[in-house]
């Protein structure tokens, strides 16, 4: 935790500030070890948590090397915060206009920026990597469960219920990802052509390609993987598309290494799909950072100017989406080393159930 705090302050100092103020729960947790309704303050003097009475007990119990101060909620918490920041040059992750203006009235420098938080969180420490690997192993177990459970006549919603029950029994929970209403993406047949498909009551039928994207939180950290299964008699086209996506993902994984550009990983995946004539059906970036949030830095995209660094945690997830027909996506979470340290062991060969 001390190394994390040192890194946070290093990035804070780079933008001309000496104090970090965290409102977002992910940043609060990274800074303090406590996830809840509170404000975190970090400077060279130490770390303080400003929390309402209902959170004080848990904040004291769960935080690491933090002073916990009780406050009122809302404006009361902001008043307590400002009173503790006299003369501070503040960087905050808040985007709330009223909060920022109130701070600016009382403090010499207030910079709204998530950059110090995201830059520090980009590189995972050994504890974070250990948690991510455990989370990934549970997702592998869930894919084994898919092989046993998926059947003709089962609905996407029914499969999600089975999988979430298994996950929650093992300490994994939904991430609160804002692009979907459901905790998982389970998309059969034509629904699979929608990368962020909502889980529906549609029942699986013979010939379906079924995209199962598992993105779940374990001890605060998110693991993310996707496998696509076939059900019954699978068309020649579906098998062909699956093999192209598999080759694309393998090329992307081979391109991953410390000091390689994020763009080069995207290029490696995209060239395979384009060469096979499906380029216009690969409609998203190749991957993203993972950690305390589903999508973190870096972005694995043809637009990215970032170079990979050792111990970044990223995904590689090419896909082909044929409207009104089916989709195929294959995704792994991995740790960047001299090569890709893939955290998932479940096969990427096409399984036809």
Task: Indicate where each model-derived feature is located.
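Active-site neighborhoods and metal-handling regions in enzymes and metal-associated proteins
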Residues: 1-353
């Amino acid at each position: 935790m001390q190394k994390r705090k040192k890194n946070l302050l290093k990035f804070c100092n780079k933008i001309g500030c000496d104090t970090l103020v965290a409102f977002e729960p992910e940043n609060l947790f990274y800074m303090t070890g406590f996830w809840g309704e509170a404000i975190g303050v970090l400077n060279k003097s130490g770390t303080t948590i400003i929390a309402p009475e209902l959170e004080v007990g848990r904040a004291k119990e769960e935080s690491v090397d933090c002073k916990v101060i009780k406050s009122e909620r809302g404006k009361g918490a902001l008043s307590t915060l400002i009173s503790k920041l006299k003369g501070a040059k503040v960087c905050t992750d808040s985007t709330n206009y009223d909060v920022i203006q109130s701070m600016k009235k009382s403090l010499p420098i207030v910079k709204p920026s998530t950059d110090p938080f995201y830059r520090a969180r980009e590189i995972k420490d050994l504890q974070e990597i250990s948690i991510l690997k455990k989370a990934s192993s549970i997702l592998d177990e869930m894919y084994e469960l898919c092989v046993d459970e998926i059947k003709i006549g089962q609905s996407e919603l029914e499969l999600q219920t089975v999988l979430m029950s298994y996950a929650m029994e093992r300490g994994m929970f939904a991430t609160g990802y804002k692009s979907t209403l459901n905790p998982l993406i389970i998309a059969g047949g034509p629904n699979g052509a929608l990368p962020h498909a909502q889980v529906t009551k549609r029942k699986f039928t013979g010939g379906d390609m079924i995209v199962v994207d598992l993105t779940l939180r374990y001890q605060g950290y998110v693991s993310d993987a996707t496998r696509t299964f076939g059900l019954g008699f699978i068309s020649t086209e579906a098998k062909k598309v699956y093999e192209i996506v598999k080759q694309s993902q393998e090329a992307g994984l081979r391109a991953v290494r410390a000091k390689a550009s994020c763009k080069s990983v995207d290029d490696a995946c995209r060239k395979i799909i384009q060469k096979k004539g499906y380029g216009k059906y690969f409609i998203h970036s190749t991957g993203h950072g993972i950690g305390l949030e589903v999508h973190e830095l870096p972005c694995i995209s043809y637009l990215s100017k970032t170079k990979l660094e050792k111990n970044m945690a990223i995904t590689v997830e090419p896909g082909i989406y044929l409207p009104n027909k089916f989709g195929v996506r294959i995704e792994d979470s991995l740790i960047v080393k001299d090569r890709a340290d893939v955290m998932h062991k479940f096969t990427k060969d096409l399984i036809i159930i």
